[in-house]
Regions:
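Small-residue-enriched flexible segments
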Residues: 1-139, 143-157, 162-180
Length: 180
């Protein structure tokens, strides 16, 4: 699944987590790890605007040959992160960044994949689900992801969609939507 996020070199080991709560990275509270990277005190990550900024720096967790996104949706008072999807202990996680261009490229890649799966049939409806962080990244270019999809599928195909708190893709076997 195309997601538009790229690793920037920082790698961490998830040393303590439980379901959707990411407690520690490399043995330190998750907010302390982000504080060291971005230069703001760890206690400030629990409050706006930094609590919102954390969403723009998700973690990529290896699954097969790709990185799946795990985004902090809330920074807790104890310095842990409430994530958009479960994170397992012991996995390696990579700090990710995105940009308008990478989001547009990912949208075009996803549209191209969808078109290939239609095997020559013309799409009658496009349903777009994008991570809420894209809305934050594209705030100065609203609709950029829609235009990118229309560049591939055409402007005459009706569109519907919305923002999600994670990657939702068609299942490989059944085609049933699944949260990665």
């Amino acid at each position: 699944a195309a997601h538009g996020w790229n690793p920037v070199g920082s790698q961490f080991r998830v040393t303590r987590s439980r379901g959707f709560w990411l407690r520690t990275l490399d043995g330190r509270p998750a907010s302390e790890t982000y504080a060291q990277l971005f230069g703001y005190p760890a206690r400030e990550w629990a409050f706006p605007p930094l609590s919102h900024l954390a969403r723009l720096y998700p973690l990529g967790v290896e699954q097969g040959d790709q990185l799946i996104i795990r985004s902090p949706i809330r920074v807790e008072a104890d310095g842990s992160f409430r994530m958009n999807a479960p994170v397992r202990d012991g996995v390696d996680a990579y700090l990710l960044v995105g940009s308008r261009i990478s989001c547009e490229n990912a949208a075009q890649q996803a549209a191209q994949q969808a078109l290939q799966q239609l095997e020559g049939a013309k799409p009658v409806l496009v349903f777009i689900l994008a991570d809420i962080a894209w809305e934050m990244l594209l705030k100065s270019h609203p609709g950029a992801e829609i235009a990118a999809v229309q560049d591939i599928l055409g402007k005459d195909v009706p569109l519907a969609g919305g923002y999600t708190l994670g990657q939702i893709v068609a299942g490989k076997e059944s085609g049933t939507p699944q949260l990665l």
